[in-house]
């Protein structure tokens, strides 16, 4: 029997909407499958023939690509296949360091296979899928879709109304906006029912909501974020919301003011911005933090964004540590205790 190394059992998978490029190191084999259950089953059959008794030791390495990689994750969970879900930034840096020019998807799959060397032991595991958490994710995805539709309809209504446009169009848009708002509320009610039906989710939700300034929707949005990215650290969570600073430097003389990246979904920032405004009025610690930033010369928006970051990192800590908010918790989070 062959003595397989970690690199030999690392299967690289470059995921796209309709297909997945696969690199199988044992025979330096490039392989393409459909991004379907049938495609995965064909791959498994091939891998079992190639690896025989070593099949159970295989590790699938891939970059999470939103909804496109969800089926792969669920399949691996069901079939007890170990995976290493590689952060795209780490993957890019590894490819650059290894001299890859990313000429094709097959090259990308090979790079992903080699990236197994980056994995810590705790990062290689069989995915755990929570049916309840998946329901919340799907409902939140639908909620974001409905909100986007409502915003588009509202903007269109404004453009028609300002020029005293067609009454039928105005009336239809007003009805559509009312319907979409009702649907948003219905989705929130459904999500809350799911949360209330699960003891752990309910506790996590209440711990997040214990921060003065974070309301029902804010707690749902953050709970969804923490469920979606269970292994993210505080810095990564801030980036996923799109509140990480982006600096602009050109040469030695041009330095623009840093801005937030806005890389995450707008709904997170929109909901949490309202929460930050409430917190600066009714949360003593957040108000003090905000006032101190203002006194030090920060603009109002900059100070509000800083409050948002602070609220998110504290909420993340409360969720992870299963604690409720208090002045002591805030001071510990700020290194004051």
Task: Report the location of each language-model feature.
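Phosphate-backbone recognition surface of nucleic-acid-processing proteins
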Residues: 210, 216, 222-296, 300, ...
